[in-house]
């Protein structure tokens, strides 16, 4: 059977000399892995993580790993390699997709979201966009956070906490008696115009990290590239964007 689709390469592992196993996040079929041969310098460039490609997968049976061929549509390497912040963010989102999404499940809406994010990241890094990407990833994984109103009173003002059990927002007054057991809701997630402080970045990464660890990272497994991104962002001062 054959599958042909547009996709983003999210992993590349050496198998033997000039032969690799690549994993591609496709628009209509989700994650697919296949064996590729890349002997020339040009072909090796095609199979870099983050490249958007025309993807052809061929196998006798669906459950086989298959043979893959790709034609390059767009490479982001030049946009990210010279900017550390962009590179850390890029590596993080690619690793999260590889670690958290299920093989051969369709995520077409999220694929479009990813392409849009990569295009925006190639122009400029915004921390707000990055956190929105992580929230969207939690959503498609089945753990959407409801930050629109207080889970108890339904008010939309003075939201301050997030319940670690329900993933829903709580107002300051409702959550105050239980504050030691709650997560902080960063102010910038409630307003598009607010500047983002370093502490709010820490709060936001703590928030998404909690739900990643609770529901999606099992057996102490985690995305190392995301850990590196967190360390970089939280230990260096960047403009509040």
From Swiss-Prot:
InterPro entries per record: ARFGAP/RecO, DNA_rep/recomb_RecO_N, NA-bd_OB-fold, RecO, RecO_C
Superkingdom as given in the UniProt entry: Bacteria
Any one of the GO CC terms: bacterial nucleoid
One GO process term, biological-process aspect: double-strand break repair
Keywords, sorted A to Z: DNA damage, DNA recombination, DNA repair
A Pfam family matched in the record: RecO_C
Biological function: Involved in DNA repair and RecF pathway recombination.
Family (UniProt): Belongs to the RecO family.
Protein name as it appears in the record: DNA repair protein RecO
Gene behind this protein: recO
């Amino acid at each position: 059977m054959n599958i042909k689709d547009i996709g983003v390469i999210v992993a590349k592992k050496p198998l033997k000399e000039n032969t690799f196993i690549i994993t591609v996040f496709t628009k209509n079929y989700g994650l697919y892995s296949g064996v590729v041969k890349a002997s020339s310098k040009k072909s090796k460039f095609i199979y870099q993580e983050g490249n958007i490609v025309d993807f052809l997968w061929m196998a006798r049976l669906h459950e086989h790993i298959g043979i893959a061929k790709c034609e390059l549509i767009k490479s982001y390497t030049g946009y990210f390699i010279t900017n550390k912040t962009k590179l850390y963010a890029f590596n993080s989102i690619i690793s999260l997709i590889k670690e958290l999404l299920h093989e051969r499940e369709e995520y077409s809406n999220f694929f479009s979201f990813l392409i849009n994010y990569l295009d925006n990241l190639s122009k400029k890094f915004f921390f707000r966009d990055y956190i929105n990407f992580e929230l969207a990833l939690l959503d498609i994984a089945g753990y959407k956070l409801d930050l629109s109103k207080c889970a108890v009173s339904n008010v939309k003002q003075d939201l301050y906490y997030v319940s670690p059990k329900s993933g829903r927002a709580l107002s300051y007054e409702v959550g105050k008696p239980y504050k030691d057991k709650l997560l902080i809701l960063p102010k910038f997630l409630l307003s598009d115009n607010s500047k983002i402080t370093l502490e709010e970045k820490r709060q936001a990464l703590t928030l998404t990290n909690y739900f990643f660890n609770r529901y999606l990272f099992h057996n102490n497994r985690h995305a190392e590239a995301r850990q590196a991104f967190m360390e970089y962002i939280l230990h260096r001062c960047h403009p509040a964007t």
